Amino acid sequence: MLPAIIFRQVQRPLHHGAATLEHVLGVGGSSFVNCLNRYAAATGFIRISFLDIKRRRNYELARLRLYADEKKQSLHLRTLQGRHLLQGVIERKNFLVDDIREARHKVQERVREKIDEIREERENIMTIPNMLTISRAVLSPYIGYVIVQGDFTLGMSLLAFAGITDLLDGQIARRWPSQASKFGSFLDPMADKLLMGSLVISLCYTDLLPMWLMGIVVFRDVFLLGAGFVIRYISLPPPKTFSRYFDATHVTAQLEPTLLSKINTGVQLATIGLSLGAPIWNYLDHPALQGLWYLTGLTTAATALSYVMNRHNTFKIIQKKT
């Protein structure tokens, strides 16, 4: 502290106080004064350097405070922005969750409605007429086999049984509506065609029926069978899967038999029965039997043509309930 005190006391060169110092200290000369001046200048420079350091330190502290305040303000703004962003994300998340929940609820409702529609479209196929029709269809190949083996008497008996089942299934379905089914409307003519095809092929094989008549009957039945598969595909609503296509309980179309088709069925059964009985009762190649062959060919071709001309009335697509 001594240099600073001396410096405060000596603020300017000591030329004017040389005599006093010489008198007090007992020294004299200009060299002593010069030494004092140099000492005062050095101590003043040191004091100025100390003041500069303090001033710079205060400046740096102020600058750091300002920088810290700016950073604090920036962090505060970012915190506010982050809170707003987080709030927006939470609101968006809640909106998406509600939207997904609502969409899932709608899908579940739609699935329930679709299941109810499919259940309504299904029908009971385990009816007595359908069982009789199925038994006739299963028996048809065996009747053909018996005829090919030459057992015409057994073949006649089985044919009579098949004819009785054909009459019974129709009577039961008309008398008791609960036993009627749209599936049966397709199954019955298909079983008749299977029976007729088995019989005409086996009778033609044993030379009891002409080849041309067999060709007409088989061609007509194959044509109608193919048309039935096409109509089934057209009338089946999406999705058109293999399992739904062959699902017998899911009926999409109905076959309306015509008067001509019923007459043709009777004529065909009479022709088959009489041709099968010819070797039993010995009237092979009888003119009346040959005339019946031509009549059967005519009615068979006429029914095929009528199905084509009146296909919109014969095959009815079942409209879905709205």
From Swiss-Prot:
Catalytic activity: a CDP-1,2-diacyl-sn-glycerol + a 1,2-diacyl-sn-glycero-3-phospho-(1'-sn-glycerol) = a cardiolipin + CMP + H(+)
Source organism: Drosophila melanogaster (Fruit fly)
InterPro entries: CDP-alcohol_PTase-I (IPR050324), CDP-OH_P_trans (IPR000462), CDP-OH_PTrfase_TM_dom (IPR043130)
GO molecular function: cardiolipin synthase (CMP-forming)
Keywords associated with the record: Lipid biosynthesis, Lipid metabolism, Membrane, Mitochondrion, Mitochondrion inner membrane, Phospholipid biosynthesis, Phospholipid metabolism, Transferase, Transmembrane, Transmembrane helix
Designated name of the protein: Probable cardiolipin synthase (CMP-forming)
Main localisation: mitochondrion
GO terms of biological process kind: cardiolipin biosynthetic process; mitochondrial membrane organization
Any GO CC annotation of this UniProt entry: mitochondrial inner membrane
Family from the record: Belongs to the CDP-alcohol phosphatidyltransferase class-I family.
Location of this chain's protein in the cell: Mitochondrion inner membrane
Entry membrane topology: Multi-pass membrane protein
Top-tier EC class: transferase
Lineage summary: Eukaryota, Metazoa, Ecdysozoa, Arthropoda, Hexapoda
The UniProt record lists the keyword Transport: no
EC identifiers of the protein: 2.7.8.41
Keyword Secreted listed: no
